[in-house]
Amino acid sequence: IRVNLLGFGAYTANRKHFWSFDLNLRTSVSTQFPYELFHFFKTGESAQVRNLGLSSDAYAEAGFNYSFPIGEKFYVGARVKFLVGLARAKSYFTQFNVSLGENEWYAEAVGELEVNSNLLTIPTRQEAGQDGVYRNYYQLDDMEFDAKFKPAGYGAAFDIGATYEPIPNLLVSAAVNDIGFIAWNKASSMHGTVSRRLTFDGAQVDASGVADIDFDLGELKFEQVDEESATRMLHYTMNLGAEYRLWDRRVGFGALYQIHKYDYAALHNLTASVNFQPVRWFGLSG
C-alpha cells in the first residue's frame, strides 16, 4: 500500500525532460499459511506443518524522479529514494506440528520472531522453561503502541524504467521498482526464538467432526535473545508491458506482466486491457 503525502513536478525548459519529487508512506504484508494448518483448525486432525510465516513493514520514502528521451523512440526514467524505517515484524516457523488434546491443543514449534520498531513495545516476563531454567519470554498479548515518531532504521532504493517504440503505434515498456534496502538499528530491535512444545487452551470437536479451536497469542512463548541490527531488502516489483494503438491512436490493446517479490513467494500477474479514447477528454478502459 502506498499513501502519497506530498508530490510536485515540472517539465524543464525544453519541454522534453521531466522531474518530480514525492513523499509517501509505504506498508506491506506477506503471509505463508500452509493448507495443513487450516485442515487442523477445521477437523482437529494432527498435522505436520512446515514453513509458517507472517511479516509486515512500514516506512516513509522521499523520492526524486527524472525522465528524458533518447532519440525519437526511446524514453528512460529513474527514481532515487531515501527511506526511513518505521516498523518491521516477522514471525516464521520452520516447524509447527499440531495435535489435539482433550480440552487443549499443542504445537511442536521451532521458529523465530523479529521486531524492529520504536512505535511498539513488547514486555518480557521470567518463566521457567521446559528444563526448569528461568528465562525472559516476550508477552505478545501485552504489546503497547506509542504514537511518538522515532525512526527505527534508514535505507535507500531506486526505480528504473524505459519505453521503446520499435514500429509506429507499438509501445513496449519495462521497469523495476524498489531495488534497495533498509538497515534497521539495534536499539529498536526485539528478537526471540522458540523451540519447544506450546500448549493452547480451548479445543473441542463436535459429533459431526467439526473442530472448535481457540488461539491465544499470549501462548506463543518466544524466548528473548540478544538484540541485533539487521539489513533487509525491499520487496521489488518488475513490470513488462506492451500496447498497440489503432484508428489514429483512439483504440489500444495492451498486456502487462508483473512480478511482485514478497518474503515467502513471488506473485506473477498477467493482465490484458482494451482502451478507447475517441476524444482527448473522454476515454474508456477494460
Predicted regions and their residues:
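N-terminal, post-signal peptide beta-strand-biased segments of exported outer-membrane/organellar beta-barrel
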Residues: 1-27
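Outer-membrane beta-barrel porins/channels
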Residues: 37-286
